């Protein structure tokens, strides 16, 4: 991380990590954010060349063209006319020590152990493997991972995997946090003058339970975070921008890329667009500024094009651009006409949705996905309360008011859309900024008033309470991140901890103290293999490289995969990557394509096309009976046949998963 020291504490915006529109210069991450943005844009551009698939040559041409487009767009979005002239560049050792080193240390705590997180096994991995080479649904496929969101972020991780390896690819999460941290620093510098304290505040703001839980995993939830924070910063400073038209295009492009990376960011994009429109109205009234029509068209293109190709592709396939969601509006014949939602998470009624931003802290298991052993310290809820408070206070800075309004608007949209905390990282960052602002405000009041002033006592009490509360939240979040675990499924469901490390020995005592259960068992012997697993770093780009001749022989007869249960499509893509995958599985308990007569007709036709070829499914041993019963939920035209025990290495010779290779027998006509 290379930084430039500020000569003053003036606000400055950051676009692709560069200082912009500020003659004082600013401290920001320069090359890192450009690399991340280039990776995002290149992968999105690659979607527009999905037609070039079917061979190494076409794929190389497609990626070359995408890279050229990516470089051109990033060059345009970066600041090419910075009028600041710093005396020189130097490394900010304080930033490295307080922010970078702790985040890297946290990442390296689990890094050697390959992450086999459920969503990755279920659809992210297989979607990435296909989308990197062409259409995400190949000839002979039917939704191989069951769910197909925009694969752009999966492609980003896929590129990182082929560059760095499977274990180090999640370093992208650390990069996103460092970029976000550099932007947070710019928000804080107007009211936290001391660099060391400001950097510590940045670390505290970044340390939330959902962020620390996924920083080591190939999850894509953090990719859009710096883009959203950048957009907010640019919107707030739009009246002072040197080139407002160009800034407007940047904002729209960042929001468009955010939507392409994560559909759930729409709950933040809508409030940010509303704030942008308000700012444009204020500027037009006060400064008589009106964007040029050509630049408005470019801004619209930046907002729409990153997702347009994929939405059009899904509409062509299914009749619903957001398939399978919002099907009560689009009525795709491939699934029931309903708006599907996670039934065990988030608010359960419209009334509960209204107060979910406050009450959800009392039921953390409904805030988190796929677990009943979570706790939450309430950063988001505190932020909502403080946002209301600062709007009622006198002399609150305009920027803080705008942050507060954005937080309140987006938090209620989030509650109505899902209410799941992993989709609220941007809101948690804004909550952290408000926490630091309120603390600095109370501290200044407490130290500036005369000793006999009654307000001094009140503010001193407020400082003490805020100190205790923020210390508790940071400590709880940090401990959550250190002791959190994902289940591994080596021999049976949740038979151990996926990425074991020494702090996991304290997981069970911590959960017992909170009267919460723990599913997995901590194995110190597996944790002790840290350096053995670390030896595979930079050598784990290709999963097939870990398969022995015996492993390959287990799957040599597979011509077609039938995905019959959640969480196995990645194993299929590793075991026999060239075989098409036809999914007939339910997606958890959320939606089921097979309830549609049209889907059953399509799937039966595809299976009949492969009649005479060997078809198989892969299952975790614990899931065999559930999968067999699930096949009987509707008539599908096939049943389970011969069952064989197999073992598959997953990015590690020692990290094997025991599976059942089940032959699929097509029913007689």
Annotate the PLM regions:
Residues 113-127, 133-156, 163-168, 317-325, ...:
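Extracytoplasmic catalytic/substrate-binding loops of multi-pass membrane glycan-assembly enzymes
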Residues 124, 129, 221-227, 258-261, ...:
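Hydrophobic/aromatic-rich transmembrane helices and adjacent perimembrane loops
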């Amino acid at each position: 991380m290379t930084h430039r020291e500020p000569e003053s504490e003036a606000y400055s915006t950051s676009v692709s990590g560069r200082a912009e529109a500020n003659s004082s210069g600013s401290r920001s991450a320069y090359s890192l954010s450009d690399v991340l943005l280039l990776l995002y844009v290149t992968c999105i551009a690659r979607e527009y060349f999905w037609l070039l698939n079917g061979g190494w040559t076409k794929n190389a041409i497609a990626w070359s063209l995408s890279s050229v487009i990516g470089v051109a767009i990033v060059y345009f979005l970066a600041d090419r006319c910075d009028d600041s002239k710093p005396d020189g560049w130097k490394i900010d050792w304080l930033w490295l020590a307080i922010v970078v080193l702790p985040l890297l240390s946290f990442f390296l705590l689990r890094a050697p152990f390959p992450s086999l997180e459920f969503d990755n096994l279920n659809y992210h991995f297989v979607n990435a493997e296909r989308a990197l080479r062409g259409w995400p649904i190949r000839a002979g496929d039917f939704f191989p991972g069951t769910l197909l969101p925009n694969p752009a972020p999966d492609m980003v991780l896929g590129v990182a995997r082929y560059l760095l390896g499977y274990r180090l690819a999640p370093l992208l999460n650390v990069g996103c946090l460092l970029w976000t941290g550099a932007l947070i620093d710019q928000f804080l510098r107007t009211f936290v003058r001391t660099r060391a304290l400001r950097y510590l505040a940045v670390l505290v703001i970044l340390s939330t339970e959902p962020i620390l839980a996924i920083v080591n995993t190939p999850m894509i939830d953090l990719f859009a975070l710096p883009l959203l924070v950048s957009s907010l910063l640019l919107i707030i400073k739009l009246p002072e921008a040197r080139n407002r038209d160009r800034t407007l295009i940047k904002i729209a492009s960042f929001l468009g890329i955010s939507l392409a990376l994560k559909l759930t960011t729409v709950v933040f994009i809508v409030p940010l667009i509303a704030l942008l429109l308000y700012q444009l109205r204020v500027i037009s009234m006060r400064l008589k500024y009106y964007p040029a029509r050509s630049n408005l068209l470019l801004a619209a293109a930046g907002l729409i094009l990153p997702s347009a190709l994929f939405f059009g592709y899904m509409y062509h396939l299914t009749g619903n651009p957001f398939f399978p969601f919002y099907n009560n509006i689009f009525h795709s014949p491939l699934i029931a006409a309903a708006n599907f939602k996670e039934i065990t998470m988030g608010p359960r009624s419209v009334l509960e949705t209204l107060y979910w931003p406050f009450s959800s802290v009392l039921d953390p298991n409904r805030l988190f996905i796929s677990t009943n052993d979570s706790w939450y310290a309430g950063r988001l809820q505190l932020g909502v309360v403080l946002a209301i408070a600062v709007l009622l206070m006198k002399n609150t800075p305009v920027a803080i008011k705008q942050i507060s309004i954005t937080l309140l608007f987006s938090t209620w949209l989030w509650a109505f859309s899902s209410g799941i905390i992993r989709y609220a990282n941007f809101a948690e960052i804004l909550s952290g900024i408000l926490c630091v602002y309120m603390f600095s405000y109370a501290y200044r009041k407490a130290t500036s008033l005369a000793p006999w002033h009654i307000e001094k006592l009140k503010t001193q009490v407020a400082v003490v309470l805020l100190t205790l509360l923020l210390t508790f939240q940071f400590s709880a979040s940090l401990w959550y991140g250190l002791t959190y675990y994902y289940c591994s499924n080596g021999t049976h469901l949740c038979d151990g901890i996926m990425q074991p490390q020494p702090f996991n020995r304290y997981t069970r005592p911590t959960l017992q103290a909170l009267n919460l259960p723990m599913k997995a068992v901590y194995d110190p012997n597996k944790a002790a293999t840290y350096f053995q697993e670390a030896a595979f770093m930079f050598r784990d780009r290709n999963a097939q490289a870990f398969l022995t001749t015996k492993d390959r022989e287990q799957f040599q007869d597979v011509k077609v995969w039938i995905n019959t249960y959640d969480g196995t499509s990645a194993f299929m893509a590793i075991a026999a990557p060239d075989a098409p995958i036809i999914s007939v599985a339910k997606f958890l308990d959320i939606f089921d394509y097979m309830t549609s007569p049209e889907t059953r007709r399509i799937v039966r036709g595809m299976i009949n096309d492969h009649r005479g070829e060997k078809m198989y499914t892969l299952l975790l041993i614990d899931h065999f009976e559930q999968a067999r019963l699930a096949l009987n939920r509707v008539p599908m035209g096939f049943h389970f046949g011969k069952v064989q025990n197999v073992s598959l290495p997953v990015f590690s010779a020692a990290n094997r998963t025991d599976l059942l290779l089940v032959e699929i027998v097509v029913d007689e006509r």
